[in-house]
Amino acid sequence: MARSSGSGKSTAMNIIGCLDVPTSGTYHLGGIDVSTMDDDQQAEIRNKMLGFIFQQYNLIPKLNVLENVELPLLYAGVDASERKERAMASLQRVGLADKCRNLPSQLSGGQQQRVSIARALAGSPSVILADEPTGALDSRTGREVLGFLKKLNREGDTVVLITHDNSIAVKADRIVRLQDGKIIYDGDAHDPRAVVRPEEMEQDEPAAGGFSDASPAEQEAGA
């Protein structure tokens, strides 16, 4: 999902992630209409069907790698032995099983992001939501993380990646472009229409003292 500032990305991400409901229309996830669910029902859907990867990793400093990956399974009520087994399997997928007893502070930025990917995978989600997952990484480490996400996609996982960077967006198979809360393109990532042009980026730059990414246009965007 390619976006520029104020495009409606935050609203769309919140709806896709079952953190908010659309003001109009419906949203179906895995054949289930989640657009009218209450908070508890949406929380259950999040635990069962969604995995989240954030720009800043969001690992708990006092927990080791294995405990961080187990956390969503703990919230889902999975028993201890199964939690450990599934968390270790997820760490194996991202190549960090040997770091399971390390604290986050003992890992590089790229390794911490891979731990967050393992945490997202532990619940066997239907969809993985990655919000600017390379934003806090250097270019080489960012490429490694993107490589992991592409690998997961080839293995059958659905990955929705939010980015403002054309060089990242074009690595996807499909791009959805947002502008002013509306989808203006949905299709092949290699189509010229899929790319955000420089003049559009300039138009979307906020003026000094202007609005942040959560602009009124974004707040009012529907599904």
Regions found by a protein language model. Name each.
Residues 1-172, 178:
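ABC family nucleotide-binding domain
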Residues 95, 196-197, 215:
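N-terminal non-cleavable signal-anchor helices
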Residues 220-223:
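Short, intrinsically disordered, low-complexity terminal/loop segments
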Residues 182-209:
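Conserved beta-strand-loop-alpha-helix hinge in the C-terminal portion
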Residues 208, 212-217:
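Short linear motifs in low-complexity or flexible loops
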